[in-house]
Amino acid sequence: MAKKSMIIKALRKPKYKTRQNNRCKLCGRPRGYLRDFCMCRICFRKYASEGLIPGVSKSSW
């Protein structure tokens, strides 16, 4: 219950910009957030490996 309420609270637009919390749009995780993709590192890795994020591919050299 606490996690659900925190996710809903983070999605609301705050009165002041500094009160904004970055949370993953998919799972609600507050840590390891990637701003460019609006998701956490775990969801990013999962979706990138499945090829669901356009322009992102696994690097190899």
From Swiss-Prot:
<feature type="binding site">
    <location>
        <position position="27"/>
    </location>
    <ligand>
        <name>Zn(2+)</name>
    </ligand>
</feature>
<dbReference type="InterPro" id="IPR001209">
    <property type="entry name" value="Ribosomal_uS14"/>
</dbReference>
<dbReference type="InterPro" id="IPR043140">
    <property type="entry name" value="Ribosomal_uS14_sf"/>
</dbReference>
<protein>
    <recommendedName>
        <fullName>Small ribosomal subunit protein uS14</fullName>
    </recommendedName>
</protein>
<keyword id="KW-0689">Ribosomal protein</keyword>
<dbReference type="Pfam" id="PF00253">
    <property type="entry name" value="Ribosomal_S14"/>
</dbReference>
<comment type="subunit">
    <text>Part of the 30S ribosomal subunit. Contacts proteins S3 and S10.</text>
</comment>
<dbReference type="InterPro" id="IPR018271">
    <property type="entry name" value="Ribosomal_uS14_CS"/>
</dbReference>
<comment type="similarity">
    <text>Belongs to the universal ribosomal protein uS14 family. Zinc-binding uS14 subfamily.</text>
</comment>
<comment type="function">
    <text>Binds 16S rRNA, required for the assembly of 30S particles and may also be responsible for determining the conformation of the 16S rRNA at the A site.</text>
</comment>
<feature type="binding site">
    <location>
        <position position="40"/>
    </location>
    <ligand>
        <name>Zn(2+)</name>
    </ligand>
</feature>
<feature type="binding site">
    <location>
        <position position="43"/>
    </location>
    <ligand>
        <name>Zn(2+)</name>
    </ligand>
</feature>
<keyword id="KW-0862">Zinc</keyword>
<dbReference type="GO" id="GO:0008270">
    <property type="term" value="F:zinc ion binding"/>
</dbReference>
<dbReference type="GO" id="GO:0015935">
    <property type="term" value="C:small ribosomal subunit"/>
</dbReference>
<keyword id="KW-0687">Ribonucleoprotein</keyword>
<keyword id="KW-0479">Metal-binding</keyword>
<keyword id="KW-0694">RNA-binding</keyword>
<feature type="binding site">
    <location>
        <position position="24"/>
    </location>
    <ligand>
        <name>Zn(2+)</name>
    </ligand>
</feature>
<keyword id="KW-0699">rRNA-binding</keyword>
<dbReference type="GO" id="GO:0003735">
    <property type="term" value="F:structural constituent of ribosome"/>
</dbReference>
<dbReference type="InterPro" id="IPR023053">
    <property type="entry name" value="Ribosomal_uS14_bact"/>
</dbReference>
<dbReference type="GO" id="GO:0005737">
    <property type="term" value="C:cytoplasm"/>
</dbReference>
<dbReference type="GO" id="GO:0019843">
    <property type="term" value="F:rRNA binding"/>
</dbReference>
<dbReference type="GO" id="GO:0006412">
    <property type="term" value="P:translation"/>
</dbReference>
